[in-house]
Amino acid sequence: MLVPTRVKHRKQHRGRMHGKATRGNTITFGEYGLVALEPAWITNRQIEAARIAMTRYIKRGGKVWIKIFPDKPITAKPAETRMGSGKGSPEYWVAVVKPGRVMFELAGVPEEIAKEALRLAMHKLPVKCKIVRREELEGGDANEN
């Protein structure tokens, strides 16, 4: 599973997700991509589940790129703990995803197989997504809905 090896600060503020993705909104490696249409936190387990779903479907052919990395720690306090006494310990890691962000890329397989693999990955993620081809993103703005 994806987790940072070292972090400068063990705990982070929650933060807010404003606007669209300005970085990571183009297909750089593959031919097909999975683009987020709404903001969300995507956990390292969800990323791994989507990756496994794609790689199992495309079998030995093709290549998958994961374009998001869970670098934000989410803390939680134990169950039945009284309020106060500080912030909880880090429980899991999330990737902050804004609309327009390309999360996964795929290449080296026919179009039908690529679309089905990305569709399977889409069902593992907590956001609405769309499947795009490299030409579609280069032609116009990917953030336009």
Curated annotation (Swiss-Prot):
The keyword rRNA-binding applies. Pfam families: Ribosomal_L16 (PF00252). InterPro entries: Ribosomal_uL16, Ribosomal_uL16_bact-type, Ribosomal_uL16_CS, Ribosomal_uL16_dom, Ribosomal_uL16_sf. GO terms for cellular component: cytosolic large ribosomal subunit. It comes from the Bacteria. One of its GO terms (molecular function) is structural constituent of ribosome. Keywords: Ribonucleoprotein, Ribosomal protein, RNA-binding, rRNA-binding, tRNA-binding. Residues 1-22 are annotated as: Disordered. Binds 23S rRNA and is also seen to make contacts with the A and possibly P site tRNAs. Part of the 50S ribosomal subunit. This is Large ribosomal subunit protein uL16. It comes from Desulfitobacterium hafniense (strain Y51).
